Amino acid sequence: MDKRWSLQGMNALVTGGTKGIGEAVVEELSILGARVHTCARDETQLQERLREWQEKGFQVTTSICDVSLREQREKLMETVSSLFQGKLNILVNNVGTLMLKPTTEYTAEEFSFLMATNLDSAFHISQLAHPLLKASGSGSIVLMSSIAGVVHVGVGSIYGATKGAMNQLARNLACEWASDNIRTNAICPWLITTPLISDLLSVEEMKKEAEERTPMGRVGEANEVSPLVAFLCLPAASYITGQVICVDGGLTVNGFSYQPHA
């Protein structure tokens, strides 16, 4: 295989890799030859996924981590540094959560929790990973954002704020760390069939309206996001950095079009 299209010999960290987009990303990177470490809060899920990945022949290791907690993030990066001998090629900050409420009803605790889980974790883990990414000689960071950081989609103002901040973080790190040969990009999915939004998609009226407003006429799947993550980490993408890329079936570019019936 052309080395531009292979991750053979590369090390990757994917946060929240036991389900949804994170699980798809772990598998995508593994298929392309990367050695992957992933973390999650649920030990049972970690063990279940690990067995599945081992059966597929993937080089995956796991550890328990709640990325909303600073001390656990520090412990995670110590583990990763030890596993990969102080070098990391790929960091995918994938963990995220949402809480649907009117803005006036959020508590201070809920604000802090969403900020810690979505934004603080991505910022701090990127900070901690910097020396490892630099040591690898060629690093790639992918921030899993959302179109809620680009346009209003009614999934909560705090969630949207965290994702908008992640998009700008990707741009800033791309410029600041370019001299260290570290690239940073953000990916902004729309509705993707994952456990995180299963309750939303179970509301038939909501799902129908979302599909009608999406030019491609459907919600996405996790394995339609993971290939983009993998591509951005490939040597073939070596000149792509600071980009915020929407994976949304065309939603964010859709204005208004009237198609008269024949």
Curated annotation (Swiss-Prot):
Disulfide bonds: none annotated. It comes from the Eukaryota. The active site is at 159 (proton acceptor). It is an enzyme of class 1 (oxidoreductase). Its EC number is 1.1.1.-. One of its GO terms (cellular component) is peroxisome. Transmembrane segments: none annotated. Keywords: NADP, Oxidoreductase. Substrate binds at residue 146. NADP(+) binds at residues 13-37. The keyword Cell cycle does not apply. InterPro entries: NAD(P)-bd_dom_sf, Sc_DH/Rdtase_CS, SDR_fam, TR. It holds the Pfam family adh_short_C2. One of its GO terms (molecular function) is oxidoreductase activity. Signal peptide: none annotated. Belongs to the short-chain dehydrogenases/reductases (SDR) family. SDR65C subfamily. This is Tropinone reductase homolog At2g29290.
